[in-house]
UniProtKB/Swiss-Prot annotation:
<feature type="region of interest" description="Disordered">
    <location>
        <begin position="641"/>
        <end position="681"/>
    </location>
</feature>
<feature type="active site">
    <location>
        <position position="463"/>
    </location>
</feature>
<comment type="subunit">
    <text>Homohexamer.</text>
</comment>
<feature type="binding site">
    <location>
        <begin position="239"/>
        <end position="246"/>
    </location>
    <ligand>
        <name>ATP</name>
    </ligand>
</feature>
<feature type="compositionally biased region" description="Polar residues">
    <location>
        <begin position="1"/>
        <end position="17"/>
    </location>
</feature>
<dbReference type="Pfam" id="PF17862">
    <property type="entry name" value="AAA_lid_3"/>
</dbReference>
<keyword id="KW-1133">Transmembrane helix</keyword>
<keyword id="KW-0479">Metal-binding</keyword>
<feature type="binding site">
    <location>
        <position position="539"/>
    </location>
    <ligand>
        <name>Zn(2+)</name>
    </ligand>
</feature>
<feature type="region of interest" description="Disordered">
    <location>
        <begin position="1"/>
        <end position="20"/>
    </location>
</feature>
<dbReference type="GO" id="GO:0016887">
    <property type="term" value="F:ATP hydrolysis activity"/>
</dbReference>
<dbReference type="GO" id="GO:0005524">
    <property type="term" value="F:ATP binding"/>
</dbReference>
<dbReference type="Pfam" id="PF01434">
    <property type="entry name" value="Peptidase_M41"/>
</dbReference>
<keyword id="KW-0378">Hydrolase</keyword>
<protein>
    <recommendedName>
        <fullName>ATP-dependent zinc metalloprotease FtsH</fullName>
        <ecNumber>3.4.24.-</ecNumber>
    </recommendedName>
</protein>
<dbReference type="GO" id="GO:0005886">
    <property type="term" value="C:plasma membrane"/>
</dbReference>
<feature type="compositionally biased region" description="Basic and acidic residues">
    <location>
        <begin position="91"/>
        <end position="100"/>
    </location>
</feature>
Amino acid sequence: MAKNSLKPSNPYNSEPETPQPRPKLPMIYYVVVIALLIGLQLAFFWSGSSREIPYSTFRTFITENKVESVRIAPEKIYVTLKPGVDSGLPKQEEGNDTTRKLLPGAKTPENEVTVNPVRDESLTALLETHGVRYEGSPGTTWISELIQWVLPFALLFGLYFFIFRRMGAGGPGAQFMNIGKNKAALYENLDEHTRITFKDVAGLDEAKAEVMEVVDFLKDPKKYTRLGGKLPKGVLLVGPPGTGKTLLAKAVAGEADVPFFSISGSDFVEMFVGVGAARVRDLFRQAKEKAPCIIFIDEIDAVGRSRGKGAMMGGNDERENTLNQLLVEMDGFATDKGVILMAATNRPDVLDPALLRPGRFDRQIMVDKPDLKGRMDTFRVHTKNMSLSPDVNLKALASQTPGFAGAEIANAANEAALLASRRNKESIEMKDFEDAIERVVAGLEKKNKVINPKEKRIVAYHEAGHAIVSWMMPENDPVQKISIVPRGMSALGYTMNIPLEDRYLMTKRELFARICGLLGGRIAEESVFGEISTGAQNDLEKITGIAYNMVMVYGMSDKIGNLSYYESNNPYYGAPGVEKKFGGETARLIDEEVKAIVESAADTVRTMLKEHRSKLEALARELLTKEMLQYCQIEEILGKRPGGQEEDSGEVDCSKKSAENGMVAHEPETTADAESTEKVGLSATELAELEAAAERLRQSRNVSDN
């Protein structure tokens, strides 16, 4: 999330200048050398495997004057026949010159044969009688035999020893030899200009304060131990993806004056049994040698999953061995003081309970998505090195990015810089940031995607329906922008609602209004064209989810009552899950209640669009002409929002310059009335409509009861 990076230090190097490492030969060179040695060894074996004939045939060849020369050795008689003489042995396959040069014994000439010697004192006389040239050859000594057999193996073992020495020094194959050693990177004595500090972490004030206390404990332990306090053994960072858990750990590495070991949870798991536990032991051994220090395990759920879940039947899960060793190292008989374990995960629900108990992870710090102030601080951090135009309003950008995590804000800021560079601007303007946010939220704009006029008209009325319902119901968030320009994978248009403030609670009326806003597109198509299309698929999915949550999770149904079927141990952190704890009759009742809520919302939307049909037509025509409308342009067509508060507080700038730039600068207040979630201003018409909807809902329930 920041441009700074951490560089592992080498604590074993005390020289002022780092020596240049020796060049490492590729592993293929060693393979070639081994192959050559094996070839030489085979040559020794093949050198003695010449063509052999019986001794009687040898004497016959002498008497028939077919022998040219003879070399007599103690172990063999080597005979050279005259050219053209057939030895009676089968022909050999032809070899090439390279083979004969590399392996001279691989192929014996056709006129050379061997004979096993026998005790024959008349052999020399027979050779002299027939004029055969002969000579003696001394036999091989035991030393030469020893060299012939031992030297190749000595060369092989020497090469083997050399390669494994290279492996131990970090050469080729070192990973195989060091498979039981941990892969943690050590950060120590980091450079002032490259390290990440707590100043680079924004929007995480509470989490940062908790972690800073741990760092301060390591720097000045007496400050805390004087009253009997103990050093915490573990800190678990929990939060959705992209919120800055790893960045917070990098800041700890940059701020702490103690060694910092960093490793990923997946680095403990290998294909070999016992490697994970060995790496855990080696990691804590090194950490204890450098205590006090910090160990950071990123994505600890890769190794810390609950035991017994996901294990193969009939086998021992390697992850369990690794986890058991981790539990022992964190709080077992052989634990030492001075080693703090930090870990990060976005799946705390799958972690083993023994890992989460106090004494191992004493603190669980929630790293959540930033609020309005946190988003503004995060924008400030990620734009501090950018050239910004004076019209850039970071507070307005923060208000336009509700629910953004730190990584998404960093991505939006980077996209804005790229857009400004693509447009050849000298600085990044507010328009660039708004386009970048829109690109992150809705996807890449597809200007070249051709839509036929009929479908374009359907999309225009669909988005206009969303906008009018959201605009006329003050419980909904204000409509910031409407577009019928295709974006992303499949979106043909979208309506962007921007909340005026961060909300943590929603009332039943607000959820009902949100369902109405989502139904606005489908009902508008039905009212104008007399038929519906597939464009409302995503809207219907959201409507179904909200309605079922109202009935099953939040207890907002009179028939179901104050019951919740919420399942906290869901497989995906942060997403509500539902576990079936009811029978078929209750399931039927739930479905009826959900359908009643959605049908009541649909009737409310039909009445509203019928009342504002002229505004629907005007908004759709303007969309077909301009393809994109901002807040001020929408306000010109639909008028002031009923019960809206942003106009009264001066939070919307509808000046001519702002309208020309196509942007609206929302600057919502960070404080809100404590009762704002319960009391919402309603017009008489809206109140009557909601009361009528409630009456229809009650009537439908009475009918179902009967």
